[in-house]
Every structure is written in structure tokens, then in C-alpha cells.
Amino acid sequence: MKLSPKAAIEVCNEAAKKGLWILGIDGGHWLNPGFRIDSSASWTYDMPEEYKSKTPENNRLAIENIKDDIENGYTAFIITLKM
């Protein structure tokens, strides 16, 4: 599912509340219709073995990444979560 910047940040906030790890974010441009991914706007954060204590930091970094991408003109995102 492609998400607007606001929705992508909301997903990260909800993931943090539920203790879910954000594995990656891919930024791109919504073209109406369609989505063009930009490989230079791909963010991943390796999941350590003892990840639960680091989940809040991971999700904070994910939100910071989205905000940086918004400033760089990206308009749509795909988020990958670890359930």
C-alpha cells in the first residue's frame, strides 16, 4: 500500500505503540495514477537480536527519515514492518 507522508508517519507512530519494528521505508512520488519509487530514498534499519528495547529508537529514526524525505520532495511511501 502506498501511503501519503502523513499516513506514513501515523503508521510509524502506531507501530511504536504496538512494539512493531520498522524494517524499511521506500520513498517515491505519487503520479496520479501510479507510484514511482526512488531507490535513493530507501531506508532500512537492521534488526538486532534483542530488538524490543531498541524499537522506540528505530521508529523515531524512521519518522525522522520520512520527514527528511518530505523536505526533499517525496510524496508517497511504502513501509515494511516486522510483525
Swiss-Prot record:
Pfam families: ImmE5. Keywords: Bacteriocin immunity, Plasmid. InterPro entries: Colicin-E5_imm, ImmE5_sf. GO terms for biological process: bacteriocin immunity. Gene3D superfamilies: 3.30.190.30. This is Colicin-E5 immunity protein in ColE9. It comes from Escherichia coli.
